[in-house]
Curated annotation (Swiss-Prot):
Residues 8-125 form the PINc domain. Gene3D superfamilies: 5'-nuclease. Toxic component of a type II toxin-antitoxin (TA) system. An RNase. Belongs to the PINc/VapC protein family. It comes from the Archaea. Transmembrane segments: none annotated. This is Ribonuclease VapC4. Keywords: Hydrolase, Magnesium, Metal-binding, Nuclease, Toxin-antitoxin system. SUPFAM superfamilies: PIN domain-like. Homodimer. The keyword tRNA-binding does not apply. Its EC number is 3.1.-.-. Mg(2+) binds at D10, D98.
Length: 149
């Protein structure tokens, strides 16, 4: 399956993509795709890094250089509220982070790469497309293999 040009990482996928053993995959991903991050995803990532006593000011500058950080725009806030209200009517509750991350992916017309696609299942009917992180990594590895042949 060809991957779309635009992707969005949720916070756990972002953390995993920035682990040492994913360095090459991350480099290829950044070279081949426009990677969007919700500002809420950035916040969660920086919280994890601050917990590990990292220099989050410097890390934030790096994130701004390599990713398209999407602020909580009016359109995203309104769409997220509509989605959440619809889910609440169906007695489905999701974390605000997940709703905003998913809405950001919908807004940017990008594939949401996540370690846990089931979390986002109720939002798929609003136009969200998801892919498990492990499948995305395999697809990127295949892209690299094909280029080497």
């Amino acid at each position: 399956m060809p991957l779309p040009p635009d992707i969005t990482f949720d916070s756990l996928a972002l953390i995993k993509m920035h682990s040492q053993n994913m360095k090459r995959i991350l480099e290829v991903t950044l070279a081949k795709f426009t990677v969007n991050l919700s500002i809420v995803t950035v916040y969660r990532y920086l919280t994890a890094r601050a917990y590990l006593k990292k220099n989050i000011e410097a890390e934030f500058e790096i994130l701004k250089d390599i990713y398209n950080i999407v602020p909580l725009l009016d359109d995203i806030a309104i769409k997220a509220a509509q989605i959440e209200a619809n889910l609440i009517k169906k007695e489905i509750t999701l974390d605000m982070e997940d709703i905003i991350t998913a809405t950001t992916a919908i807004y940017t017309n990008s594939l949401l790469v996540t370690d846990d696609p089931k979390r986002y299942e109720p939002i798929r009917r609003f136009g969200l497309d998801t892919m498990p992180l492990d499948k995305f990594i395999k697809e990127v590895e295949l892209m690299v293999e094909k280029e080497l042949i």
